[in-house]
Design a protein with these regions (language model features):
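A short, aliphatic-rich beta-strand micro-motif
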Residues: 142-151, 158
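Signal-transmission linkers at sensory-effector interfaces
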Residues: 1-38, 44-46, 67-69, 186, ...
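GAF sensory/regulatory domain recognition
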Residues: 41, 53-98, 121-122, 160
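Interdomain signal-transducing alpha-helices
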Residues: 43, 107, 111, 116, ...
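Short regulatory alpha-helical segment in sensory/regulatory domains of signaling proteins that mediates
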Residues: 23-28, 39-48, 54-58, 95, ...
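Regulatory loop-to-helix N-cap segments in sensory/regulatory domains
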Residues: 3-11, 135, 140, 155-157, ...
């Protein structure tokens, strides 16, 4: 039996190494903006996504855009970059009911990963805002993966949303594979714990300074 690694095996090995390296980096990072940058860039590498957005839950009522990257459009907002042009927060509830029509909100409210092959063919969610933005930018948001950030206390503190997985050989936009979804979920779990710990440390530091 040949022990030679196939291209698939090499990719899986590289992704596992990337996950391990990310886990170490996430646990040691003290700057929350750098932490969010690391989450987005690593998740895009793991899934070969063209774009990614990290949302954070605010007061249990809305989702705040914390960072947004898109390689094709050369967009980098939030994190260590400018927050000026970030979209407004998304309400988790409208008129007392859960905002299940928006993918990111649905992921928070249900705690489940959502994998959509083509947003333009999907009728389960409201993509009118996405389509309007695409038309303005000359882009097509096709495949989409939304992963809730659930920490060690099972609290959902945000959502990692990735768009347009690309075939590494052809560059064509494809659906996110089951393996890509698993890698994103593994990273999201690490990221949620790291973000929770960092926010707690920042809150403790602010409280300490208030007593000085």
């Amino acid at each position: 039996m040949s022990l030679e690694m196939t291209e698939y095996d090499k990719l899986q090995s590289a992704n596992l190494n990337l996950l391990l390296e990310a886990g170490v980096a996430l646990s040691g990072e003290k700057d929350i903006d750098v932490l969010m940058e690391l989450i987005i860039t690593t998740s895009m590498k793991l899934t070969n996504a063209d774009g990614g957005t990290l949302y954070r839950v605010v007061d249990g009522q809305q989702l705040e855009f914390s960072i947004l990257h898109n390689r094709s459009l050369q967009v980098r907002m939030g994190g260590k970059g400018s927050r000026q042009d970030l979209p407004p927060p998304l309400p988790l509830f409208t008129q007392g009911a859960g905002n299940y029509s928006h993918v990111a909100c649905h992921a928070v409210l249900t705690g489940k990963t959502i994998n959509i092959a083509d947003a333009y063919l999907n009728e389960d969610f409201d993509f009118s805002g996405t389509r309007a933005s695409d038309a303005q930018l000359g882009y097509r948001s096709q495949s989409l993966l939304a992963v809730p950030l659930k920490n060690h206390e099972s609290d959902i503190i945000g959502v990692l949303q990735l768009i347009n997985a690309q075939d590494p050989q052809t560059g064509q936009v494809v659906a996110f594979s089951p393996a890509a979804s698993q890698y994103a979920e593994a990273l999201a779990s690490q990221a949620a714990v790291a973000l929770t710990n960092r926010m707690l440390m920042d809150q403790m530091a602010a409280l300490f300074e208030s007593f000085i």
